[in-house]
Every structure is written in C-alpha cells, then in structure tokens.
Amino acid sequence: MLKKCLFPAAGYGTRFLPATKSMPKEMMPVVNKPLIEYGVEEALQAGMSDICIVTGRGKRSLEDHFDVNYELEHQISGTNKENLLSDIRNVMGQCTFSYTRQHEMKGLGHAVLTGQTIIGDQPFGVVLADDLCITLNGPGVLAQMAQLYKQFRCSIVAVQEVPANEVHKYGVIAGQYISDDLIRIEDMVEKPTKKDAPSNLAIIGRYILTPDIFDLIHDTQPGKGGEIQITDALMAQTRRGCVMAYKFKGERFDCGNIDGFIEATNYCYNNFYASSSEKTVNRSWYR
C-alpha cells in the first residue's frame, strides 16, 4: 500500500531570484497557500500520509510551515482569521513529516536517493512541488496514479504532451499504448533536442516508484554537470521489467518559471476564491 511520498526540495530556485534568496521556491504562495502545501494535500488525498521532504541549506521555513506557531495561534485565537489556518491544521493532523538534507545538488536521481533511509523498502510517490497539478472534478493526479499502481504494481510517471520546441526542458518518453492514456515505456531520453526526441510526451513532476529504483540510481553514472538523472534509472528499470507512463486528467502549471506561476495564481484565484465575497472561507481544493 502506498503510504509514503518524497518531496525533493533542496534546489536553489534561481529563476525566482531575488525572491528565493531567502525563501525556498517551494514556499512561494499561489494565492495564499505555498506550493509545498498544495503538493502535500495532493499526496494526502492519494493516501500518502508519511511525508519525506529532502531539504538543503536555507530551507528551514519548510519545516516551520508544517509545525505549530504558538504565538500566531494565540494572536488570532477567537477571531475570524482562525479559519485561515484550517487547511494546514488538517494536513498537520493527518500527516507525519520527516526531513533529510541533500548536501550537494546532483540532480533529481540523487535527491530521490537521499531519501532512501526514510522511504525504506516500500513503493512511494514523488512530488515536485513546483509542478502544480489541479483537478477540479475527481481525484488528483497522484491519486489517479495510485489507482493504476494497484493494478500494475510497477513504477509510473505522469506525462503530458508539450510543443516540440519545448521537449528539451523535459525527460521524454515513447512506448506502446495500452489505452488512450496509458503507455508502456520503451524509450526515454532526458532533455533531448527537438530532432532526437522520441515523442512529445514529457514527464512532469509526479512519480510512483518501486523501491528497487534506489539500487538502480546508485548504479547510475553521473551525466552532464555531474547530475544523476532519474530517467536513466527508470530506463534501466524498463529493461528489467515494466514502467508505465500515464496521461493524467487535470491542469498542470510549471511554477518553476514566472509565466507558469502567474498562470497558476490566476487559475486558483478564479476557481477557489473569486466566487466568494468572504475571503477567509476555507478553500481547500483537494477534499
């Protein structure tokens, strides 16, 4: 059963400087909620209540966010502002949080490997918080993938079609279609050129991984820039067995860049806040 979810969150967030000079990019607020909280809510909806966050230097606010602030609680006690904390209280009440540090930035594969001691020998989810996924009707993206895992018991990556001139930003897959939205992966290339891309199906920041991925990452040689890519380990897993790609239902916003972040903010405001005249109302999307 899927209970654990890993959040790689040690990166510098340089595309959002100077804001991220003193604030983790995962704490950037979309309307009034930080990106990391949206991701944890999505994991919780999928049944993953054991949250492991891979942090780094200057990321202490991630830990503080999922903790009680007694001074603040006392200050707003008995006022209508108490309701503004209802979502985070619910998350804190249902999740356990563990933290481990990634001392060197060596790619997503290395970040996942850093969480091995906490994850252990269990299948687990991975959420990249700067990929904000919203599903207005029905289960969230990770919950959709968790249902598929019950059937296939293998690693699964979320994918979406991207323009051909953007494939160089992503890991790109190709394979055999099992259904309209499910592909058995046969090829996978990290950040290919337009010419070399096997398709326009790009991996986004949602994964379900089986625990044998750790040994495969450990055996993966660093590539460009000394980074260990998760796609290399997944391709090795494909050769040994099966890895699925899933074309998810819902909206995805790349909040790792300013345009995507603004689009996400407008979307969330219009769908969760604009219809309410009282902005202190609870607007958790994931229930």
Give short role names for the model-derived ranges.
Residues K59-S61, L132-I134, R252-D254:
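Short, active-site-adjacent cap segments at secondary-structure transitions
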Residues K4, S49-I51, P123, C154-S155, ...:
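Residues at the starts of beta-strands that form the adenosine-phosphate
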Residues G125, G138-L142, A146-K150, Y177-D254, ...:
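Catalytic-core segments of class I nucleotidyltransferases/pyrophosphorylases
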Residues L35-Y38, H110-T114, A233:
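Well-ordered alpha-helical segments embedded in enzymatic catalytic cores
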Residues L2-K81, G138-G140:
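N-terminal glycine-rich phosphate-binding loop and ensuing alpha1 helix
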Residues D64, L72-Q75, E82-V172, L209, ...:
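Conserved beta-loop-beta/alpha segment of the NTase-like Rossmann-fold superfamily
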